[in-house]
Amino acid sequence: MSDKAPVTMLDVARAAGVGVATVDRVINRRAAVRPQTAQRVLEAAERLGFRRVGLIRSRVVQDSRPRRLGFLLQSRRTPFYRSFAAGLAAAARQGEPPVECLIEHLDDLTPRHVAARLGRLAQQVDAVALVAADHPTINQAIEAVVAQHQLPVFACVSDLTTQALAGYVGVDNRKMGRMAAWLLSRLCPAASKVALLLGSHRYLCQEQCEISFRSYLREAAPQFHVLETLVSLENPQLAQNAVLELLHQHPDLAGIYVAGGGIEGVVDALRDTPQPRLVTVCHDLTDITRQALLDGTVTAVLSHPLPAMAHALCDAMRQAIDSRRSQHRLQNLLPFELYSAANV
């Protein structure tokens, strides 16, 4: 029976010319280690016959392959999500280190379908980001992914309430809603009637925009009358019908804030009406909203800074992959952009 003492982490560290903490990081992935350093640790462990050499080898192999980021976005038919997807692909290529990017678009936004697609995507990537409604089924799916795959999951565009998230990257929707209210209060006649259109109350971003919009007018322009909120379910046809009915019922309407999807339908409705042009504020600069600004159908656009948001999200996901044990929840709020016919 051999009296030789077992090889320790200290022995491996000395043979590799690194500290014990570095060997621990390679084994337990507590933090990022440069590939060259990890390879030295592996070679030293193999030479010495370290009992955990198999684990070190698997870690080195895992860490040597390109990272893959997964994104679950909404319909490709929506100009905003086409642009966001292009920005994410560019950010993945340009960042350091470059990563692979797997982007999936959803037409079916029912919570059960979103949850199922999230579960499948999580099996193919190292980190996930999604745009989703704040629904218990979706939040439970995120918690299951984090528990089963030890995978960082981020919310983007619209935050979520589950504590399992690694973070949120987007704009400050409270400020966005207040800015919309400020614009309407300055551009509409005093004591006007104004309307608000959402895609769904389930999206926290839209809920926050609505709350802050109403809050600002209540605080700074109480003479304004805000009508009951309309909901489009992110559907352009429903949005068009809702606005046409709104204009029929309220011919004295002075302004409208479109805080959700379906802007294509809203623009069509406003162009078809013989009534005087409304002060219209909506979200996100696309080919459709740019043209609507230029022809006067839309007054102002509050827009997500898509290239900056894509880079911030990819950077956050890279960092989360390399520090999986971090309990810190990232909150990255980027400033939104304001466009009118004067600066598009």
List each language-model region with its residue ranges.
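N-terminal helix-turn-helix DNA-binding module of bacterial transcription factors
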Residues: M1-R57
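A conserved helix-loop-strand patch within extracytoplasmic ligand-binding domains
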Residues: M176-A195
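Hydrophobic alpha-helical
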Residues: A127-V146, V231-I288
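Short helix-capping segments at alpha-helix termini
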Residues: Q94-P98, Q148-H149, L217-F224, Q249-P251, ...
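Flexible loop/hinge segments that line or gate small-molecule binding clefts
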Residues: T137-K175, T286-L294
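Hinge/beta->alpha junction and helix N-cap segments in small-molecule ligand-binding domains
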Residues: Q74-Y81, I103-H113, D134, V169-R178, ...
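Amphipathic helical "hinge" segments at domain boundaries
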Residues: R52-A116
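Hinge/cleft segment of the Venus flytrap/periplasmic-binding protein
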Residues: L217, L306-V344
